[in-house]
């Protein structure tokens, strides 16, 4: 089996690893992926022949296809996601911990013979611009052609990565299988998966990933959450940088001044919408560097610089429309993969929110005729996978090896009460406390109950690869480096509701009005803010509200300090932080006491 494929691999350790894996999983053949367009077309063709991929109408969506997953494999599975470290305390209370050696033994049992009857694909990939100091190279071994096609879109993948790796470069070993071996002559499932034995496992001792049983996005595209966040956050701590669940945008004002912001929101809370925002206010421009992950390093001038390590967008489809995100729709017009959306009779895609009325004759995400009034036609976590270069508002510096300088960091969540529209941290320590205090109503991006409020510090709860309290400490440590020019930190909340349960703020493109205030604050405008215990809030006259029909009461709700609500908030955060015990940094404890004491004074 070795002689045919090994000619493409010059790296001795990589060649040896592929051979070891092949002996364990016993595939029918091995293919080294070169990342070419012709390879993509060929593998997509194989998926089409087997019934996995449904080609879409070429007049509407050229070179696009639809894939339907198993109903048992539709989202991230946090309960089956593990961090393996030598000591349990290094994983911390927010991660599922397992002993690395015990877990390796268990996984070797699961992987033994698991690719029988399937092709083993070797997918070399790079997270971050090639030959950038930011970048990490990985190699994913998988038996899923869907993963190969998705990795072609989501990462820099193939021959150019092998060339950059050379004969001795370091790489992250990422092993994936759907976990369904095939007997000779056995017909394959449309979406093979093994939900009873799902495992997504991160080994921090050798910076590797093993994923078994799921073919869904974040569980199977191992460059994304697994390498770019769970492994990278662990590496970043030891090397003095940050790997964050953040979008990156460039914002230009009417005078031509440009600033870059990074913003952190839990999954399905509007990151992609903000990253591709189409301003209503004349003269302003927002350009997208990335919509999901940011790697942030101190630059030679003391500023923090960020890159988007990804090469594509993996966006939530429901709710995306010409009104909410026209740029996202334009991005995924061609060369894209749609997963678990509905299909129209003329070969187009549809999902809830795309149009006000569903077209007739829809086939739902499970391949069944759909009738209005029942279950959604598209799964709530249905996705589009699309190349970043197709984004009409892509920032010119999106692929810069040095990254872009960040002047503001923004933290937000889905909160119906208490949290104001926007507020600025009083200090870096306070800003870290804002990030650590984040909570949000849960969404369909992960398996579990939706709409329940859960704490999600820095929107990293599912993605931090080590003890979250140590992660807070790492953030705080940046303030002790006096050579750094740290960005200002902000909290935002687009999701406040009135007493009737209606959203107060229009959101979407109108969020630029908040970005405009942040922009002015980073320019040092003092008079547009008032100091409060929770941070600097906008003066009501400082927000550009032209064209909005906001009542005085609505504006007051958005921009005032709800003292009883905030006292409850502080108590709630303090109670949550008990899970970290003595590992919780004293600075966060002190900041919570400061906020509480100052609130009691104005009460």
UniProtKB/Swiss-Prot annotation:
Its EC number is 4.1.1.32. Pathway: Carbohydrate biosynthesis; gluconeogenesis. Keywords: Cytoplasm, Decarboxylase, Gluconeogenesis, GTP-binding, Lyase, Manganese, Metal-binding, Nucleotide-binding. InterPro entries: PEP_carboxykin_GTP_CS, PEP_carboxykinase_C, PEP_carboxykinase_GTP, PEP_carboxykinase_GTP_C, PEP_carboxykinase_GTP_N, PEP_carboxykinase_N. Substrate binds at residues 76, 216-218, 267, 381-383. The active site is at residue 269. One of its GO terms (biological process) is glycerol biosynthetic process from pyruvate. Its cofactor is Mn(2+). Binds 1 Mn(2+) ion per subunit. It is found in: Cytoplasm. Monomer. HAMAP family: PEPCK_GTP. Belongs to the phosphoenolpyruvate carboxykinase [GTP] family. This is Phosphoenolpyruvate carboxykinase [GTP]. It comes from Chlamydia abortus (strain DSM 27085 / S26/3). The lineage of its organism: Bacteria, Pseudomonadati, Chlamydiota, Chlamydiia, Chlamydiales.
């Amino acid at each position: 089996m070795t002689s045919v494929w090994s000619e493409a691999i010059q790296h001795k350790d990589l060649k040896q690893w592929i051979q070891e894996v092949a002996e364990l999983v016993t595939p029918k053949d091995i293919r080294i992926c070169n990342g070419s367009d012709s390879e993509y077309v060929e593998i997509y063709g194989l998926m089409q022949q087997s019934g996995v991929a449904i080609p879409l109408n070429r007049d509407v969506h050229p070179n696009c296809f639809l894939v339907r997953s198993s109903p048992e494999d539709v989202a991230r599975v946090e309960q089956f996601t593990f961090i393996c470290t030598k000591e349990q305390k290094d994983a911390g209370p927010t991660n599922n911990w397992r002993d690395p050696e015990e877990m390796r033994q268990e996984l070797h049992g699961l992987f033994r013979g698991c690719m029988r009857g399937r092709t083993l694909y070797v997918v070399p990939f790079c997270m971050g611009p090639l030959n950038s100091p930011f970048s990490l190279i990985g190699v994913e071994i998988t038996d899923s052609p869907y993963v190969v096609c998705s990795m072609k879109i989501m990462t820099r993948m193939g021959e150019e990565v092998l060339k950059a790796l050379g004969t001795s470069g370091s790489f992250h070993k990422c092993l994936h299988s759907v976990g369904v071996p095939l007997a000779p002559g056995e017909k394959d499932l449309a979406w093979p998966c093994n939900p009873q034995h799902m495992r997504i496992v991160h080994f921090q001792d050798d910076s590797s990933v093993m994923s078994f049983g799921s073919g869904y996005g974040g569980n199977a595209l191992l460059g994304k959450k697994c390498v770019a966040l769970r492994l990278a956050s662990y590496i970043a701590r030891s090397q003095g940088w940050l790997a964050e669940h953040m979008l990156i945008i460039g914002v230009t004002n009417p005078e031509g001044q440009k600033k870059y912001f990074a913003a952190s929101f839990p999954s399905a809370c509007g990151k992609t919408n903000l990253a591709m925002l189409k301003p209503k206010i004349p003269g302003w421009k927002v350009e997208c560097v990335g919509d999901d992950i940011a790697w942030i390093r101190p630059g030679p001038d003391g500023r923090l610089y960020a890159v988007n390590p990804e090469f594509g967008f993996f966006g939530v489809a429901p709710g995306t429309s010409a009104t909410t995100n026209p740029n996202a729709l334009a991005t995924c017009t061609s060369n894209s993969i749609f997963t678990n959306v509905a299909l129209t009779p003329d070969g187009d895609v549809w999902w809830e929110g795309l149009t006000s009325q569903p077209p007739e004759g829809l086939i739902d995400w499970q391949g069944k005729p759909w009738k209005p009034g029942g279950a959604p036609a598209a799964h709530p976590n249905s996705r589009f996978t699309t190349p970043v270069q197709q984004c009409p508002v892509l920032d010119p510096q999106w692929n810069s090896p040095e990254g872009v300088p960040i002047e503001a960091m923004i933290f937000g969540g889905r909160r119906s009460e208490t949290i104001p529209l926007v507020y600025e941290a009083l200090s870096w320590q306070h800003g870290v406390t804002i990030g650590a205090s984040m909570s949000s109503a849960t969404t369909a991006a992960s398996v579990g109950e939706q709409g329940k409020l859960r704490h999600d510090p820095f929107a990293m709860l599912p993605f931090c690869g080590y003890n979250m309290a140590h992660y807070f400490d790492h953030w705080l440590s940046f303030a002790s480096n006096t050579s750094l020019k740290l960005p200002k930190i902000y909290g935002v909340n687009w999701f406040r509701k009135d007493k009737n349960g209606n959203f107060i703020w229009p959101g979407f493109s109108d969020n630029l009005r908040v970005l405009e205030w942040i922009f002015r604050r980073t320019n040092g405008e003092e008079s547009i803010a008032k100091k409060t215990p929770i941070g600097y809030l906008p003066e009501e006259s400082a927000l550009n509200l032209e064209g909005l029909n906001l009542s005085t009461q609505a504006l007051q709700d958005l921009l005032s300090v709800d003292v009883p609500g905030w006292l409850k908030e502080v108590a709630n955060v303090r109670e949550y932080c008990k899970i970290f015990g003595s590992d919780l940094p004293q600075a966060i404890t002190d900041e919570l006491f400061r906020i509480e004491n100052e609130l009691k004074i104005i009460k």
